[in-house]
């Protein structure tokens, strides 16, 4: 049966008679194999509809429909373990494992998680969100079950983009050392979020160019045949051994494929046959991201994720302020035009980090190193050693993966590397796996490193210039999404290192005084809360935009301390070990004995919701800030 090709996202729930009867994979396994193509088509229609209702990851899910059906049909889940690397592609898995009716809540507050989550379902065997962890986790499960003498099949589904990370190969190397019973399904769609880059992508292309398929018979025996996608040519006279040679075999895995990842019945044959073999096995399949939805097949990058469909409004659309990532991208181009020493590095996040324009304008100065955060940081260090000025664009949550390199390879040598740290703070619907909640804590203990946090998009631009001009490692940490709508100054101006600015004084003549030290994205809401407090309680309040987490402006704290009855620190970061902790440390060192209230993210992983909901939930919106300060202030007043 040919695959259906859809051109529009349905706004009405599709008719899915087979899918409606599947609330557990056991019900799927009771169907005839000949019915699986219809199940896959119904599942694709339902994913299209559900994504239109809720938004979320899109193209990757459409690309693994047939694979997901085949896996749950062949393997005894949840006894057998399926581990989805990253988890962008797990929506069909969630539908087939009893969460069909909840799928429209995905990524919403109190809804399904954006990625597989152990607390959500017994079928979600490992919590994911970051790349390239599945093989390590799967190997751990396989070895544990061997030790417990309770074996099961463990299948890790990994994309070609995730396979570029060193962690994946570390795990494969170890799997061979232990001769582990482990299956790795390489889902090759020539895409991560951006296009796959580097030698590994070329290696996969070379496997294709051989024109050979390593197939498997019903007894689990491998044999080589001409690939059905290729016409006969002289290359097919290579020996079977030479034809099958590739990196995976060199490591020690049995290699099979490449197979059509959209041929569900052949995938069932392959998986059933592979269950008759033991040891490390890699199954190479090729899929198309966005399969079955014509616009996504044509433009998989744009359709990596979508927003939910909303009713058309006749009201004019208000233009949003630029995103911080776009402000970064424009600064990068402007700075590069003035200094040919600037080189830019990204670990596979060109689009998300706002670097598309730079990559087109300066291709020889742009380096997409694939999903390799450790390498990205040390690559920058090497460039800096040769007198160049590299800029690393990286999400806060992913810089965690390059922490040793940040310390050992950059800061210890005091190298001139600039870090543009995107997605700092809470990130809304992607939930705790992608939150940038810990960067102050893991960076501010590092000697030589300057850390800045802008209050708005214009200050972000000027801080990036300041960091770039600084002779040493410097980081600018900015949030996801749009700025505040302030005017962006085109001229690049350096800020004084370690110097804060006073942005608001309410009733400065009053003796009773609160000083708010705000960092980054919380400056504007701190000002809003301060004005409300000053009006309600007739007290003096000063709000300071601290700008620098390190070095801290100790002078302004010291100057304000004499007339301050309460210090308040506010940050969109974990309150433990964050910027507020840096203020506490200084106050203790200077023996300034003043009550201090630290506001930030609580010591818990914040559940997914919209960014606005998350801020409200942890008391970091203007109303929550006002209430927290008011409670402590009234206690101080009553004690006097």
Swiss-Prot record:
Main enzyme class: transferase
EC number(s) stated in the UniProt entry for this protein: 2.2.1.7
Single GO MF annotation: magnesium ion binding
One GO CC term on file: cytosol
Residues binding Mg(2+), per UniProt: 160, 189
Cofactor binding remark: Binds 1 Mg(2+) ion per subunit.
Pathway: Metabolic intermediate biosynthesis; 1-deoxy-D-xylulose 5-phosphate biosynthesis; 1-deoxy-D-xylulose 5-phosphate from D-glyceraldehyde 3-phosphate and pyruvate: step 1/1
Keyword Magnesium in record: yes
Residues annotated as binding thiamine diphosphate: 88, 129-131, 161-162, 189, 293, 373
InterPro entries membership: Dxylulose-5-P_synthase, THDP-binding, Transketo_C/PFOR_II, Transketolase-like_Pyr-bd, Transketolase_BS, Transketolase_C
Name of a matching Pfam family: Transket_pyr
GO biological process: one example: isopentenyl diphosphate biosynthetic process, methylerythritol 4-phosphate pathway
Keywords associated with the record: Isoprene biosynthesis, Magnesium, Metal-binding, Thiamine biosynthesis, Thiamine pyrophosphate, Transferase
Catalytic activity from the UniProt record: D-glyceraldehyde 3-phosphate + pyruvate + H(+) = 1-deoxy-D-xylulose 5-phosphate + CO2
HAMAP family: DXP_synth (MF_00315)
Family that this chain belongs to: Belongs to the transketolase family. DXPS subfamily.
Protein's job: Catalyzes the acyloin condensation reaction between C atoms 2 and 3 of pyruvate and glyceraldehyde 3-phosphate to yield 1-deoxy-D-xylulose-5-phosphate (DXP).
SUBUNIT field: Homodimer.
Protein name: 1-deoxy-D-xylulose-5-phosphate synthase
């Amino acid at each position: 049966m040919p695959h259906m090709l859809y051109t529009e996202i349905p706004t009405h729930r599709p008719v899915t008679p087979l899918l409606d009867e599947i609330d557990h994979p056991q019900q799927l396994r009771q169907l005839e194999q000949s019915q699986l193509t219809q199940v896959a088509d119904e599942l694709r229609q339902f994913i299209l509809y559900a994504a239109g209702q809720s938004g979320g990851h899109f193209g990757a899910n459409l690309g693994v429909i047939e694979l997901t059906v085949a896996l749950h049909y062949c393997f005894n889940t949840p006894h057998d373990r399926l581990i989805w690397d990253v988890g962008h592609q797990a929506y069909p898995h969630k539908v087939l494992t009893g969460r069909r009716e909840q799928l429209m809540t995905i990524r919403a507050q109190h809804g399904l998680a954006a990625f597989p989550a152990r607390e959500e379902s017994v079928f979600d065997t490992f919590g994911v969100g970051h790349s390239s962890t599945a093989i390590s986790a799967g190997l751990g499960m396989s070895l544990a079950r061997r030790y417990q003498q309770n074996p099961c099949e463990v299948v890790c589904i990994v994309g070609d983009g995730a396979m570029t990370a060193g962690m994946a190969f570390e795990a494969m190397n170890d799997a061979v050392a232990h001769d582990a019973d482990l299956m790795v399904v390489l889902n090759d769609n020539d895409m991560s979020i951006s296009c796959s880059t580097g030698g590994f992508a070329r290696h996969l292309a070379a496997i294709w160019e051989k024109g050979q398929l390593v197939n498997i018979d019903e007894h689990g025996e491998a044999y080589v045949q001409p690939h059905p996608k290729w016409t006969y040519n002289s290359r097919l006279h290579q020996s079977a051994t030479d034809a099958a040679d590739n990196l995976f075999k060199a490591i020690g895995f049995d290699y099979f494929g490449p197979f059509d990842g959209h041929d569900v019945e052949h995938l069932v044959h392959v998986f059933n046959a592979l269950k008759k073999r033991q040891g490390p096995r890699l199954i190479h399949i090729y899929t198309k991201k966005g399969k079955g939805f014509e616009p996504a097949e044509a433009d998989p990058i744009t359709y990596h994720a979508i927003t939910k469909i909303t009713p058309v409004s006749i009201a004019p659309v208000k233009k949003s302020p630029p995103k911080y990532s776009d402000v970064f991208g424009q600064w990068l181009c402007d700075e590069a035009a003035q200094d040919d020493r600037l080189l830019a590095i990204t670990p596979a996040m060109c689009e998300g980090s706002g670097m598309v324009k730079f990559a087109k304008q300066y291709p020889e100065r742009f380096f997409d190193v694939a999903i390799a955060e450790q390498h990205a940081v040390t690559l920058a260090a090497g460039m800096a050693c040769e007198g160049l000025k590299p800029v690393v664009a990286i999400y806060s949550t992913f810089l965690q993966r390059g922490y040793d390199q940040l310390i050992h390879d950059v800061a210890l040598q005091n190298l001139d590397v600039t870090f543009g740290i995107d997605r700092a703070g809470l990130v809304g619907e992607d939930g705790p796996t992608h939150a940038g909640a810990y960067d102050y804590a893991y960076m501010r203990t590092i000697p030589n490193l300057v850390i800045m946090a802008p209050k708005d998009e214009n200050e972000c631009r000027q801080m990036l210039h300041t960091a770039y001009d600084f002779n040493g490692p410097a980081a600018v940490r900015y949030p996801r999404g749009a700025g505040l709508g302030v005017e962006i100054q085109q001229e690049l101006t350096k800020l004084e290192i370690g110097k804060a600015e006073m942005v608001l004084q309410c009733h400065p003549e009053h003796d009773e005084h609160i000083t708010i030290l705000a960092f980054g994205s919380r400056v504007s809401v701190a000002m809003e809360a301060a004005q409300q407090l000053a009006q309600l309680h007739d007290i003096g309040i000063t709000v300071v935009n601290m700008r620098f987490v390190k070095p801290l402006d100790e002078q302004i704290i010291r100057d304000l301390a004499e007339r301050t009855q309460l210090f308040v620190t506010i940050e969109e970061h974990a309150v433990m070990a964050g910027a507020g902790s840096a203020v506490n440390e200084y106050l203790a060192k200077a023996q300034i004995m003043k009550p201090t209230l630290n506001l930030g993210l609580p010591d818990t992983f914040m559940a997914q919701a919209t960014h606005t909901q998350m801020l409200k939930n942890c008391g970091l919106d203007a109303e929550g800030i006002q209430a927290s300060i008011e409670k402590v202030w009234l206690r101080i007043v009553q004690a006097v």
